[in-house]
Amino acid sequence: MKIFNYKRVPYAEMRAFSVHILTASGSFLAFLGVVAAAEHRFIDMFWWLGLALLVDGIDGPIARKVRVKEVLPNWSGDTLDNIIDYVTYVLLPAFALYQSGMIGEPWSFVAAGMIVVSSAIYYADMGMKTDEYFFSGFPVVWNMIVFTLFVIDASATTALTVVIVSVVLTFLPINFLHPVRVKRLRPLNLGVFFLWSALGIFSLLMHFDTPEWALILFIVTGAYLYVIGAVLQFFPALGRET
């Protein structure tokens, strides 16, 4: 007499589910980031956040490779991914901004509140992507914005202005770049993105004591990534293959 009726799990399902576990691990990395931010260890927080973003960058291609949607149709990788993205792209950066007191009281609290509410609404927008894979409206990449504010040691006025402008742009039909999927100027866009990322890592290694030359390059490349989508929107022939 069998007490337990075990069912053999096919290897394909085990492999596919392991990808969901990889994606979900981003939540634990984000939790470690929250702990670090709560203790004002912002350098450590950004390292944890960077590791979470690395996981976010590799889980998608792996999921497509092992056909997760086909093998596990009852498990939504998109929903899981959105949950992790909201925590790592929005909630953790907003908490870090608040904890840092960069904007002062009560505006750090107000700014963080604006970030989390506007971003939650943006995630419900089914039309956030254009036909060319631009984001329509600021794509709530608050991880990049808040990280930039830390790197440049932004003043309260600068930080609050950047937050307000970005929140407003969340709801306007202004294009923002997806550096990988947008085809127009893709080599240049990817080059600028990788340079910005390398400079950010360098700044972390320097504990935000960044040399002036690196700081200028970081600001220029970040500004390019922020505005190039709108530039390509208003100049539709720019970067198109002839």
Curated annotation (Swiss-Prot):
CC terms in the record's Gene Ontology section? plasma membrane
Which residues point to the Periplasmic side? 37-41, 98-100, 155-159, 209-214
Q: Which NCBIfam families match?
A: PhCholSynAgro
Q: What class of enzyme is it?
A: transferase
Q: Where in the cell is it found?
A: Cell inner membrane
Where does the sequence pass through the membrane? 16-36, 42-62, 77-97, 101-121, 134-154, 160-180, 188-208, 215-235
What is the required cofactor set for this protein? Answer: Mn(2+)
Keyword list (alphabetical) reads: Cell inner membrane, Cell membrane, Lipid biosynthesis, Lipid metabolism, Manganese, Membrane, Phospholipid biosynthesis, Phospholipid metabolism, Transferase, Transmembrane, Transmembrane helix
Q: Which InterPro entries match?
A: CDP-OH_P_trans, CDP-OH_PTrfase_TM_dom, PcS
Could you tell me what this protein does? Condenses choline with CDP-diglyceride to produce phosphatidylcholine and CMP.
What are the EC numbers? 2.7.8.24
| Gene Ontology MF terms | phosphatidylcholine synthase activity
Q: What is the lineage of its organism?
A: Bacteria, Pseudomonadati, Pseudomonadota, Alphaproteobacteria, Hyphomicrobiales
The GO biological-process annotations, alphabetized, read as:
phospholipid biosynthetic process
**The family this protein is said to belong to:** Belongs to the CDP-alcohol phosphatidyltransferase class-I family.
> What kind of membrane protein is this, topologically?
Multi-pass membrane protein
What catalytic reaction does the record list? Answer: a CDP-1,2-diacyl-sn-glycerol + choline = a 1,2-diacyl-sn-glycero-3-phosphocholine + CMP + H(+)
**What name has this protein been given in UniProt?**
Phosphatidylcholine synthase
Side Cytoplasmic, residues: 1-15, 63-76, 122-133, 181-187, 236-242
